[in-house]
Amino acid sequence: MSGSYGDAAAWEFIDWNDPFEVDEQNAHLAKHPGLCLDDALDVAANDPLFYEACAGPADWLMVAEVPGGDVLVVPLAPSNYSGYMKMRPIGVYPASGELLDAYLRDREDQSDA
């Protein structure tokens, strides 16, 4: 069963102790030196914000500041096997451009609330 996270209510079904579906296709997530699945787990564990993806195979972009101060983005595709219980990460990248600006603005708005 596959799942799409178009409905925000679906996020409540994620197993946050083991959030990712990883197989041979996405086992080598990082295209940037020094980034790996552990970095994606850091993003998931550090109060991420979610943004709808505009293009490509990802439905959502999970963004968070990780230990060390870097802001990383993990594109998420629908699960191939686990329905709504797992997210399927398809990369780990440093956040940049408009996405980084939106994340920093949204975090600032949260701290002002």
Feature-to-residue mapping (PLM):
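Ribonuclease/tRNase effector modules and their secretory precursors
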Residues: 1-113
